[in-house]
């Protein structure tokens, strides 16, 4: 396995197993690691490794915006769900990529929406 991929996978493994040890980037070009993480949509998880990169400020701002969006969606979901339950309206929260099969046009399924099933 190429050192770039080994380092990338070790960083992700450490994140998933709560190991706080930073992974040394020996022999790995930080720009190549940045491009790999960008390709796999995992840049926010590798943020500490890019502090010396010119894109760091922009990436940090993007990460903050992404987190804010997730928190807003989480709040909206909880609020909507609690309002329906308070009115004794049964509902089921639908999550996951499998929902995309139910949309005739993939663009109709955007991130940031709330999918609920309310039985008749």
Task: Report the location of each language-model feature.
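Active-site nucleotide-donor binding segment shared across nucleotidyl transfer reactions
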Residues: 79-114, 118-120
């Amino acid at each position: 396995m190429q050192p770039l991929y080994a380092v990338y996978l070790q960083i992700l493994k450490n994140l998933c197993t709560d190991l706080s040890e930073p992974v040394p980037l020996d022999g790995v070009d930080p720009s190549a690691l940045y491009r790999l993480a960008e390709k796999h949509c995992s840049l926010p998880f590798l943020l500490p490794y890019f502090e010396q990169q010119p894109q760091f400020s922009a990436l940090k701002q993007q990460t903050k915006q992404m987190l804010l969006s997730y928190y807003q969606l989480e709040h909206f979901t909880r609020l909507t769900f609690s309002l329906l339950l308070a009115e004794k309206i049964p509902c089921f929260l639908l999550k996951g990529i499998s929902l995309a099969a139910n949309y005739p046009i993939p663009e109709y399924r955007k991130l940031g929406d709330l999918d609920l099933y309310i039985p008749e």
